[in-house]
Amino acid sequence: RNALRAIGVPDDEYDPERASAFLADMCRVRAEWVNETTRKELERSLELEAAGAEGLKATPEGVFENAIENRSVSAGTAIASAVDGWSAIEAARQVGADAQKRWVTTSRNPRPSHAAMAGVTVGIDEKFPNGMDWPGDWAGGPDEVCGCQCEIELVTRI
């Protein structure tokens, strides 16, 4: 709704039902990423444990502790970024706004690929040069998405 207000469109012109497919796909992809990362970390922890290593990720218990203390925060941030970016773009599309989208890098320590995107503006239906439609777009894969704090700014054409 904030995205609608930003471009001067009444809230009731947005159809929230169209978000259902996006949210289902996003949750499916994110669950796959979480499960794959957890599997890899568990396999590695068993190797480390067998070798007598110590540390947070050196036991299966430590893998889950790390997931709760660290990975969950990073995942939550990335999911919020993805939903925010997608919803702004979808709202503009649904109301037929003549708008562009600008990548806004907000992190104090962004990954280099996201720092390079700062201020890049493209058409609402175009991909950014990194192949993503918005920050948090799973097209970037987990290495580009996890922990992403970037945002989208809608730019209306006058």
Where are these regions (language model features)?
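Domain-core detector
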Residues: 1-147, 153-158
